[in-house]
Amino acid sequence: MGNLVIGSRGSELALWQANHIKERLKKECLIESEIQIVKTKGDKILDTPLNKIGGKGLFTKELEELLLKGEIDLAVHSLKDVPVVFEKGLDLACITKRADVRDTFLSVKFPDLMSLPKGAKVGTTSLRRSMQIKLKRQDLDTESLRGNVQTRLKKLECGEFDAIILAEAGLCRLEIQGAKYRKAFSVKEMIPSMGQGALGVEMLKNHKHFITLQKLNDEKSAFCCRLEREFIKGLNGGCQIPIGVHASLMGDRVKIQAVLGLPNGKEVIAKEKQGDKTKAFDLVQELLEEFLQSGAKEILEKAQLF
């Protein structure tokens, strides 16, 4: 029998993630595999902000097409990039243990967000981050920052930006210090994207190794990530819209924090729910209802114009 084929994007971070799964497959499932690099739409279009490209699955669609054709056996994604509704026949075989979920401030000159001068330019790919930055500092200029982690850091070092915001998990995985000043926001200060810090392994549901891959699943991380994805699904959202949501477990209790608003930091809704773990999905529905009653759908429609 031939090796399983892992589909992955070609960035250093994506390949770290694919190799991580490759090593775990060998060690924990006794399965040999090889990696096939796939360029996605989001990788090909680098001169346009992600929200302007349009469509869902900017970093997953091409991988999903290869899964459906049987040309690859599994696709390794950053879970935050995975649409909440799957193509027919596909699903997540596992969600890995979460790394650090936080967003991180990086700058050559300034120690933190509040020390930036008025009009400072902050680079980010994310409308969610832009919204939460503007909520704190309306006087800052948030601009689109595309490219892989190293490209973004070079733009910071060359002075194109006064600061940039990256995911802490990616910096840790690549063992990158990043810049002279590096400070992670607490989850309370900046609510992460759904699934941030976790990897999702996508496969055909009828693949003979679909069940086998569940050995790589982390139950606690998967539970929290599925709550977050349920919240996004209820708002018909994707990864390119200004929504942050984070679920965390504290013993038998769960806390779900969420925020959405316009990318300019206006018309922001922020709420949280806490309760018994056994009622977690009911809590998500209650939180959704509160957001919808507060005008969430209307705000997200306005956000499409940015």
Curated annotation (Swiss-Prot):
Annotated family: Belongs to the HMBS family.
PROSITE patterns associated with the record: PORPHOBILINOGEN_DEAM
GO molecular function, one term: hydroxymethylbilane synthase activity
Gene label: hemC
Required co-factors: dipyrromethane
Reaction equation(s) it catalyzes: 4 porphobilinogen + H2O = hydroxymethylbilane + 4 NH4(+)
The protein's name: Porphobilinogen deaminase
UniProtKB keywords: Porphyrin biosynthesis, Transferase
Family annotation (Pfam families): Porphobil_deam, Porphobil_deamC
Function summary: Tetrapolymerization of the monopyrrole PBG into the hydroxymethylbilane pre-uroporphyrinogen in several discrete steps.
SUPFAM superfamilies: Periplasmic binding protein-like II (SSF53850), Porphobilinogen deaminase (hydroxymethylbilane synthase), C-terminal domain (SSF54782)
GO BP terms: protoporphyrinogen IX biosynthetic process
Miscellaneous remark of the record: The porphobilinogen subunits are added to the dipyrromethane group.
Native source species: Helicobacter pylori (strain HPAG1)
Involved pathway(s): Porphyrin-containing compound metabolism; protoporphyrin-IX biosynthesis; coproporphyrinogen-III from 5-aminolevulinate: step 2/4
Textual note on the cofactor: Binds 1 dipyrromethane group covalently.
Binding partners and assembly: Monomer.
Enzyme category, top tier: transferase
UniProt-listed InterPro entries: HemC, Porphobilin_deaminase_cofac_BS, Porphobilin_deaminase_N, Porphobilinogen_deaminase_C, Porphobilinogen_deaminase_C_sf
Modified residue annotations for S-(dipyrrolylmethanemethyl)cysteine: C239
GO cellular component terms given for this protein: cytoplasm
Entry's EC annotation: 2.5.1.61
HAMAP family registered for this protein in UniProt: Porphobil_deam
Lineage: Bacteria, Pseudomonadati, Campylobacterota, Epsilonproteobacteria, Campylobacterales
